């Protein structure tokens, strides 16, 4: 029997390659979409769940029968941030269903104790905190929720996302961003690889091309 994973944000920039990558690795997928026609995926291994990520019944339906959760939920920088609200609901539902593995993404500008960022990356993080203070505060709250959750979580910090670039070598670092951009394909590949990789459980690695 195939392991089944739930995907939130699977039609966005970072997530649109996730479902196909997961199927190639032998997983079955349950993917949340607001509008099913937005997804052009046509695969018997992919089940589309229509709904809103803020709705508890939708999240319960999405996660039922799953072994792990991948969250790439995204929204415009100027929108009222919902990251922590949705992550809190996902965590609660995962606990109810006894799902342990969670893999998510956040911005590389999120500072964490122990970071050893270059001067340029430090300046970039400061600029983001000034320009998008509400969003960055919500992303920090999201991290704190995961840290307190007792789940096997990994929160991957990303640079600028390039949608149409080909797959390249993925650079990884625990303490600083190793590049300025990454392709959507490589984000998907790295996230799928983490489902059974314990190396980054409870950690916030940086990745880039």
Identify the role of each PLM range.
Residues 5-25:
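N-terminal Rossmann NAD(P)H-binding glycine-rich loop of SDR-like oxidoreductase domains
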Residues 32-37, 52-53:
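N-terminal Rossmann-fold cofactor-binding loop
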Residues 47-66:
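Conserved Rossmann-fold cofactor-binding substructure of NAD(P)-dependent oxidoreductases
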Residues 67-70, 103:
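N-terminal Rossmann-like NAD(P) cofactor-binding module of classical short-chain dehydrogenase/reductase
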Residues 76-104, 141:
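NAD(P)-cofactor binding segment of oxidoreductase domains
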Residues 82, 156, 180-192, 203:
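Substrate-positioning beta->alpha
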Residues 143-164:
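Conserved beta-loop-beta element that borders a ligand/cofactor-binding pocket
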Residues 149, 165-170, 194-203:
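Glycine/proline-rich active-site loop of Rossmann-fold NAD(P)-dependent oxidoreductases
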């Amino acid at each position: 029997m195939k392991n089944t994973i739930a995907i939130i944000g699977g039609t966005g920039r970072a997530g649109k390659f996730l479902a196909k990558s997961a199927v190639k690795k032998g997983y079955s997928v349950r993917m949340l979409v607001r509008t099913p026609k937005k997804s052009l995926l046509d695969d018997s291994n992919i089940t589309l769940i229509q709904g809103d990520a803020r709705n508890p019944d939708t999240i319960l339906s999405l996660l039922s029968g799953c072994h792990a959760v991948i969250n790439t939920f995204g929204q415009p920088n100027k929108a009222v941030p919902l990251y922590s609200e949705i992550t809190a609901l996902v965590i609660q539902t995962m606990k109810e269903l006894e799902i342990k593995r969670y893999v998510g993404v956040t911005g590389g500008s999120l500072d964490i104790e122990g970071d050893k960022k270059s001067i340029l990356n430090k300046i970039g993080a400061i600029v983001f905190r000034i320009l998008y203070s509400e969003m960055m505060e919500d992303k920090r709250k999201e991290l704190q929720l995961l840290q307190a959750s007792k789940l096997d979580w990994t929160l991957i910090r990303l640079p600028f996302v390039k949608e149409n670039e080909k797959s390249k070598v993925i650079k990884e670092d625990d303490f600083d961003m190793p590049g300025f951009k990454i392709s959507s394909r490589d984000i998907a590949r790295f996230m799928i690889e983490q489902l059974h990789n314990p190396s980054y459980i409870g950690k916030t690695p940086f990745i880039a091309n």
